[in-house]
Amino acid sequence: MLDTANKKLLGRIILTALVVVTLIVAPYTLTDPMGLPKLSMLAFFAVVALSLVLPAIKALFRSEFRTLVILLTLFILQIILVLFLSGADLGAQFYGAYTRNNGALAYFALAVLLFSSSLVSDKEFVKRFIRIVLIIGAILIIYGNIQYLGLEPFPYKTLYTVNAPIGTFGNSNFQSAFMGLIATVAMTMALNTAFKVLVRLGFATMGLASIVVIYETLSSQGYLNFLAGLALVAILWLIIHGRKTLAMAAAGLALMGGGLVFLALFNLGPLARFIFEASVASRLYYWWAAAKMLIDHPFFGVGMDGYGTWYLRYREAAMNKGFSTYTNSAHNVFADIATSGGVVLVTIYCAIAVLVILSIVRIIRRKDGFDPYFLATVGAWFAWHVQSFVSINQLGLAIWGWLLSGLIIGYEINTRVKETGQVLPTKIKHTGKKAKVSVQLLSSKSIISLFAGVLIGALIAIPPYYVHARFFTALYSSDLKAVESATYLRPIDERRLSHGASMFIGNERQSEAIAILRDGTARYPDSHDLWSIWAGIQAASASDIATARAQMRRLDPFNPGWK
C-alpha cells in the first residue's frame, strides 16, 4: 500500500490534474485549442500518478481494492486487444479523432486517475476536492459571463449561438452540463446546517449563478443534470435523516420525471415541446448508427474513437442532408465506448458504474449522519452520468466522471478500513507539551519512480502537442515548404494531412496536394475527408477521380452526390 508521503503527493497530483485538464486551452498555438492540450495534460498527470502507484500494485491486488484493480486491468487489456485486432490505424486509435481525442491514451489515463483517486479518497480529501470544485466552478461562472457579454479575450469561433458561453470546453452544451454539475455541488453544500447562514447563502447564490450561465448557453443539458443530481441528493438526505417514506415518494416522483424526459427524447409526452428539438432528434440517429456498428462489430468495436470513420456507412438514409450529415461521436458516452471497444469494453465500464452505486449504498447504510461533502460528490457523479447519456466525452468533462467514480469507491473502502482499525496510525513525535506530526519524506525508490514518471509522461504528452503547434505556425506563415514539412511530422494524423492538402489546393499547387492525398489515403484508406478532397481536384487524373469517387460511394453510400 502507499505510504503517507506518496499518498499526499498523489492527492496533490490528482487535484492539479483536475484543475489543469478542465481549464487549459491553447488558442494561439493549435487548430484544436480545447481538445489536444487537455489530452496532453491528462496523459502527463496520469503517467506521473501511475509512477507512484505502480510500486504498490501487487499489494493492491490483495487489498480491498482488488475488485476495482481487476476491473480497470481488464478495461485496459481490452483496449490493447482493440488496438491490434479492430483493424483500425494504430496511431488514430491511440490519440483519437480530431477535437475528440477519445483514443486509447485518453481512456488509459482516465482509468489510472480513477484508481489513483480511489487510493487517496477519505473524508478529508473529499473536502479538499469539493473546495477545488467550487473554485473551478467560480472561475467558469465568471468566464462564462465574460463570454456572454461578448468580451471573450481569445479568438474563438463557434458554429452555434453567438456569445453563448463555451467555457474552456469549446461548446455551449459542455459548458451547460458543467454548470449543472457545479449547481448540484453548490446547492448540496447549502443544505449543511453546520455552516453559518451567510455561508449557506453564498453557496445558494453560486448555485443560482450556475443556473444563470446554463440559461445563457441556451442548452437544456445543464437543467436536466442539475435536477437529476439535486433529486438524488434530496432522496439520500431524506434517507439519512430517517424519513424513508418521504424518500420513497421523492424517488417515485424522480422516476416519473425521468420517464417523461426519456419520452420527450422521442417527441412524446408533455415535456416534448420543452426538450425535443432538431439536435435531440439527430442524437436518435447517432445512437441507432452506434447500435448497428456494435451489432456488426461486437467483440472489438470499430476501433478506439472510430465512430466517425464508420458513421456515414451506418447512418440512416434520411440523414443525408443538414448539419447532422456527419459526426464523429454518438453523443452518448456509453455508445461511444461500445463502438470503440465492443461489448466487453462497455460491459466493464458499466461494471465500474455499478461498483460506484454499491459503494454509495454501503456508505448510506452505515448511518454516519449527513456529510455534505460526500453527498455533493455523489450528486456531482450522478449529474455527470445524466449528461453523459446525451453528450460527447469531452476530456475537460470526462475527467470529472472518472475522478468522481474513484472518489466514491475509495471513500467507501478507506472509511470502512478506518472503522475496523486497520489504518496505520500517524507517527507522532512528542516534544514537550505539544505533539508534532513527523514529516514523512519520499523514499529514494519513490523519487526514482516519480522522476521516471515525469520523464515518460512528458515524452508521451509533448509530441502530439509539438507537431500540431508546428503545423499551426506553418499554416499561418503561408510558407508551403513549412506546411509540407509539418504535415509529415510524427506522430502523423489524418487531419493534418487533409489540412495540408487543402492548403496546397488553395495555392494552386494541386500536384503537391495529390502527393499528400496519395500518402494519406494509403495510410488512412477509410478517410472520408481525404478521398472527398481528392475527388474534387480538377487536375487529378480521370482514373484517380474515379477511384476517389468509388471510395466515397463505399464510405458514404447514402449520399446521392456520389452515385
Where do the protein language model's features map onto the residues?
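Short, hydrophobic transmembrane alpha-helix segments
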Residues: V25-L39, A56-F61
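Transmembrane alpha-helix boundary signature
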Residues: L52-S63, I80-Y95, Y148-E152, K418
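A juxtamembrane structural motif centered on a specific transmembrane helix
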Residues: M1-D3, T193, K367-F370, S405-Y465
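Flexible juxtamembrane loops connecting transmembrane helices in multi-pass membrane enzymes
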Residues: A164-T168, F226-L230, M256-I295, T325, ...
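Alpha-helical transmembrane segments of multi-pass inner-membrane proteins
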Residues: L2-Y28, M41-L54, L72-I76, I80, ...
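Hydrophobic alpha-helical transmembrane segments in integral membrane proteins
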Residues: L265-A278, S443-K481, R495
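TM-adjacent membrane-interface loops and short helices in multi-pass inner/ER membrane proteins
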Residues: S117, N171, L284-T327, F334-I337, ...
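C-terminal luminal/periplasmic domains and tails of membrane-associated envelope-modifying transferases
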Residues: S443, F451-G453, L475-K563
